[in-house]
Amino acid sequence: GEDTFRQLCAYYDSIYDQADNKNCSLSDINGIAYKDKESKKIIFTEPRSIMDMSKIPFCYDTIDDFSNRIIYYESSRGCPFSCSYCLSSVDKSLRFRDIELVKKELKFFIDQKVPQIKFVDRTFNCNHAHAMEIWKFVKENDNGITNFHFEISADLLNEEELDLISDMRPGLIQLEIGVQSTNEVTIKEIHRTMKLERLKEVVRLIQAGGNIHEHLDLIAGLPYEGYDSFKKSFDDIYQLHPNQLQLGFLKVLKGSYMFNHAAEYGLIY
């Protein structure tokens, strides 16, 4: 995490400072692996404790000009779900930044009239109270300029959330909705807990409001999704008429369930 990277940077910086070089060692940095110069062995240091999200420093207050900038912001880290292609499924922990701290930082961006803030929370609306608190805040503090981007699971949205976002200024928020596939066999195999018909219903309800840009995602190359199946997935989503349809290709990430079962699926990458 951030502490590990900071210490690693300090170590390499010290290499150029002969006075401090003797006091720094990779073995003192928890949470890394490195190759020892002498033994040529791979050394694993002590694991590092999971960092408190609220202790991560806010670094954007050092920027003077926010015009034409996109800010990436994180109010939570981790995901409660187990999608097999995602590394978040390996670490089941889900933690949040203090909500009052989040509001303070978002107000800073709003006051600076940042054009767009992209939340990188893996599933922003996995916690109803957290999502509602932030959505209410951005609605109440709308400056008429800043746009907020959220990655959500559409089938999790309830009536209270839908009512709130339906009353927002057009362009205040945009929603990226991960579908990945409409093949039920594929959805089950990749461990997604997605209610497809509910997702379609929610997408149409949001469209009816005419105030929110919808961005729907698909992944090509998933297990049991051949050309014909993917064509159907594409057609199913295209027929929903999203503002944007994003097609990504499967990335087999080391350590993920997908990586460990790649041979079984016959994946070539």
Where are these regions (language model features)?
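Short, hinge-like loop/turn segments at secondary-structure boundaries
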Residues: 12-15, 135-136, 233, 262-266
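N-terminal [4Fe-4S]-dependent radical SAM core
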Residues: 29, 33-75
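Proline-aspartate-enriched helix->loop->beta-strand connector
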Residues: 1, 114, 242-243
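Flexible glycine/acidic-rich beta-alpha junction loops that bind and position SAM and/or redox cofactors
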Residues: 81, 128-129, 185-190, 220-228, ...
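Glycine-rich beta-alpha loop elements in corrinoid/cobalamin-binding modules
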Residues: 1-46
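Catalytic cores of alpha/beta
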Residues: 161-165, 223-239
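Radical SAM [4Fe-4S] cluster-binding motif and immediate context
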Residues: 56-208, 220
